[in-house]
């Protein structure tokens, strides 16, 4: 029996339908919002997965082409299984607020699939998918500390808006996705146009208020139609093993975890664990994994207690201290721009490549085909954390970190009119000990400046952490990897000196107050300004020109009606220009012509040819052309490529011309002046108008006859 739950969000009905579709799933919900219809299913296996110590949760978001009335491209004309970047990012977006809400010790396979069945071209389905996944889990038997829900927040004309449309987002200064539970936020993802810390804080708590009706609706669904929840996983009974591990390790563990360097810290901790196992002897036989789990939990307690009690961090820094920073630009001579950014033991190499408009990334989405002229690709090779493993394609994490850094940099990029290049940045993480995505932001900013890209300002990023026990709180700036793993929050903030451009927050606990978030944002600003100051010592302004090996791009405007003249039949003319000059030419429908060339000389030659091909005759202008055809009444002269005009026989010379061929022959070069262009585009030319007037010949007067008077007869 189908049951419907409706809640008003942002002036539209958010509808949850239960009991009609996908009844074999552990939980299934059809979510409707605007024209969006998303089927969210959750399935939990009845058997535990053996041999693992993590939650085996998989989340997949799928956009079907039929949802927007489209047929997929490609030879097979069907979705081929490999997720798009948008699908990958949305899958991560759904996963992040859900994963922390599962109980510790749950090792059953859980799969969540959100399928877009109908797509609203003005409302992104990602929010509907996240809410649908949360509702499907709420009514499933899976143990889950929900409900959880999400909204998107924009700011249009100074007013905060819930779930703004795509049209509104174009004008919005904020684009935040906020997920929360009844007593706090658990996830934030988004970008901004130089927002202040107070604006971000206001938007977050505005979102928290707007989440409450959705949370109440999802909770009601669980109460009315939800299946009986499975009992929480049993807490392992380790007997007296935890006490034995504490006796053997606690006193020495603090010295191990407070080693300043990551490698030394890891080696000391691993060595101590081996010593504990040896000391336990037969007690630990067959229970090595249990000992490791107990030891890891003890390590977490020791670190957190040390930070809160000593007001210092495991590498010796204070809460607001930033690790030492150094960097360099221009170390790769053949590239178009490069920079290395190092903060403590985290290091990223960013490389800029400039391309032409034809290098833009073509993307198929529910909205149709779009093109992307700025791409940032983040790579996290195994050696950056001292590991050896097989290399594969980019992981979801790599795609997500690249998207975060791309969002941070985008607001400072020049417009296509100012800088008509396609820009690709690749960030190679060479060493990682916390916040490699924010190191990518810093390195990218420097690499763009090194390449001569006229960015509006430098961008830096920092990751903030939190340790909270009761009323004791420590907000940490520029966190290490261990502080991320053992802490309660990972809050990444990026921006310029003027404001925030991107942020990402994942909270592992609830009940974080406005004051704590305000403190985190304030510390992040101080850290960002410090990092920007250090970056400015390396490079503070974009280079005055492009690198030697960067392509030279010139943009000229032609009459759109003349595009066919440049392309020619079957592309013949444009191919000739490319072969003759060695340039690359891209022509847009509005008549903009992008000419990419290795040298300025070749670009100038291509411009001259295109100008000649697209030039239009002007009344009064003088042209030198070739006689194409001789007629009885005049001569047709080609004054511009594919542009002929008529020189009437009366306009050939000042004197009367009996035959056109007496003055001109086919193939002759002749200079003419445009007298008139009629409504049909016919051109009247004159040769005579450019000739000196012929001198007038005065006819000789005949000699006067003198009459001799006749003699009269006398």
Language model region names:
Residues 25-111, 116-118, 123, 189, ...:
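Glycine-rich, flexible beta-strand/loop modules in the N-terminal catalytic cores of phosphate-handling
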Residues 114-116, 186-191, 232, 236, ...:
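Short, hydrophobic beta-strand segments
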Residues 141-259, 448-544:
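Mobile "lid/hinge" segments at catalytic clefts and subdomain interfaces of large enzymes
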Residues 2-5, 9-12, 26, 54, ...:
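Alpha/propeptide regions of enzymes that mature by internal proteolysis
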Residues 1-45, 49, 56, 230-368, ...:
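Extended amphipathic alpha-helical scaffolds
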Residues 104-110, 145-147, 214-232, 263-264, ...:
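Flexible, glycine/charged-enriched surface loops at secondary-structure junctions
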Residues 27-29, 123-141, 329-352, 433-454, ...:
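Conserved phosphate/anionic-ligand binding catalytic regions in large, soluble enzymes, centered on
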Residues 549-553, 560-714:
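Single-stranded RNA-binding regions, centering on S1/OB-family and related RNA-binding modules
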